[in-house]
Amino acid sequence: VASPNWAIGVNFGTPMPDVSADVRGISISTGRARVLDAFQSGTCRIQLDNTSGKYTPLGDGTYGASQFVGVEVRVLVTLNSATNPTSLFRGFVEDADASFPDAKQSTVTLTCSDGLAVLGRTEITDVDFDAEVGSVRFSAVLDNAAVAYPAEPGTPSSADPRNRDIDTSVISMAAATVTQLSTSTYLARLAQSEDGAIFVRHGMPGGASVGVGDKGGVLHYKKRNADSYATGLTFGPSSTGASTPPMTALDTIFGAELLYTKGVYQRAGGADQIVTDTLQTPTYGIRTLVRRNLLNLNDSDVLTACSNFVYRYSSPALRISGITIKPRALTEAQAEKVAKLGVWDGILATFTPAGAGAALIRALRVEGVRHDITPGDWTMRLNTSGTGENVYLVLNSTTAGYLNENKLAP
């Protein structure tokens, strides 16, 4: 049985106070529910025991006169005697709401968001972009004076955690002038044009060892065809193996939720790029995904992205949409690996459906993570995506390619 050691920091001063002793509950949600959704700002709600009045904003308690809005928050956990804790969330306080159900009780709930919310509060105004690959365009947006997203330092330290992780793209974006457009809206369009992803990542990619400067909350740009982070984890029935943690529940989807037989993609100023799966259309009808006003320079890149998508999702498949884990019920070694999981991690899941005789194995990518934590319990939910194909069809790796499947789509 794992025994997590928590450190919940709220930056009321230097050093950052640890408020763990007063925490009644934490809810964290990061990433997205499914592969077609845009990545949303991660959120964290921390409920604090405020019986002593310690956290009442503008009150007479210990932190009453402190700044609340905009201060940094970190949710860290140490497992398996690790040298450095794993970050489940790093972000900033948006609201601090006090509740007084009677004369003797009080709670304060801190509502927090991560770096995507920071981008959502800025606007790109009268900016000229050169023709450049997507990753260069992304950096140019972040470095624009009106956005000013924190830079990634060359040598991360405990005081200066790294904030960016940007893949090098080969997909060219057209030169453009952007006038008065929300930064988050523009970056969502950039991610679609890249056929990649932009998200804030918590945890530790691929289950790597946590360094001193790895505090989570890292803004990622994933290029087209980017592989998942290989974790080596296989979720299944009861097991004590460090790389085979048990799950408590598994959800699947099968049907029209991810079923498209036609795609219409178009870059700004370009012609419609239309792909139709003529073999599947007579069976499932015309089901169209439309993406217009993409930022690409070349129609060929747009057509490739459209083809990748249609031929991945033109027939229904049994897909695992999520798995649930109870980290406290795992071994220390298992819990440490599971706690590090975040968006874009690659995992396997094995399960035997009710009434079936043989176990199925699926290769999955993590799309979102939810933590629900109380002093005596911890539930973790992973939102996942995958092709729906069995692992025995895998070509080269469990996260990067499937025999006779187009592996280039998300």
Language-model segments: which ranges?
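Hydrophobic alpha-helical membrane segments, chiefly transmembrane helices and signal peptide h-regions
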Residues: 110, 137-140
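Acidic Ser/Thr/Pro-rich low-complexity disordered segments
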Residues: 4, 82-84, 151-164, 229, ...
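Hydrophobic, Leu/Ile/Phe/Ala-enriched alpha-helical segments that form helix-helix packing faces
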Residues: 77-79, 141-150, 190-194, 347, ...
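Short glycine-rich, low-complexity/disordered patches
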Residues: 70, 151-160, 317-327
